[in-house]
Amino acid sequence: MLRLEECRNYESHDFRVLPVIGSGEFASVHAAYWKNTQSKFAIKKFDKISTEKEIINEINLMKMVDFHPNIIKFCGIIKDETNYSLVLEYADSGTLGKYLMENATTIKWESQLKFAKEIASGVLCLHDNEIIHRDLHPNNILVHQHTIKITDFGRSSILNGVREKPIPNTNVKFIELYQKCWRNKPDERPEINQVISELNNVNPEINFNFQVNELTEELKNEDGFSDCDLSNY
């Protein structure tokens, strides 16, 4: 078991801390610059009720898996008068939820499929190391340079069970896969290896062709476009 004194220790004055970029029930996250440089980090500040044991547990879990490209990297700790803070890799595009909202009309299907594969790859790494995240949702998944980063290995919580409705024009195979992952009985849900296998078999061209054909049909109903066939372009 790791001890806090074995981690790289930073002083609070080593960073120029910026306003809060995210917060939860037990901690807040700030962006921060290292000294007088443009090197940016994320500082996770725990509240006063977080115990040293809980903090050590979160650090241990991160250090077991942060070699993976889709898991946020742990850089060190800061100890001040009241509590500890974690120094973490900074994700320049924020949470996946925020990223999808800001790019809802422009994000391509290929990017969506890439993100899904990266999330599955990160989860597989956790499971290979016998770690269950327990609180994986779009606000605990970050995007850095168009790459997924899973974060927040703190306390577990129970979500409200609300499931999103399929977004129009989403690839049918993709919808079928994530609906299987939502099944109420755990033994009816696919294993993570099966999820990755099925994601690798999803053909983004099918979704693209569907959208082109749908648009072609719409244009055929418009005056002057009866002979239009976008599938040739």
Task: Give the ranges of each region predicted by the language model.
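Glycine-rich ATP phosphate-binding loop
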Residues: 28-48
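Short beta-strand micro-motifs within the conserved protein kinase catalytic domain, predominantly
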Residues: 73-84
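Protein kinase glycine-rich loop
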Residues: 18-29
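Conserved short submotifs of the Hanks-type protein kinase catalytic core
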Residues: 82-95
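The N-lobe alphaC helix and its flanking beta3-alphaC-beta4 segment of protein kinase-like domains
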Residues: 47-72
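Catalytic-loop of the protein kinase fold
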Residues: 127-143
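A conserved short helix/loop substructure at the end of the activation segment
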Residues: 182-194
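Activation segment of protein kinase catalytic domains, centered on the conserved DFG
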Residues: 102-114
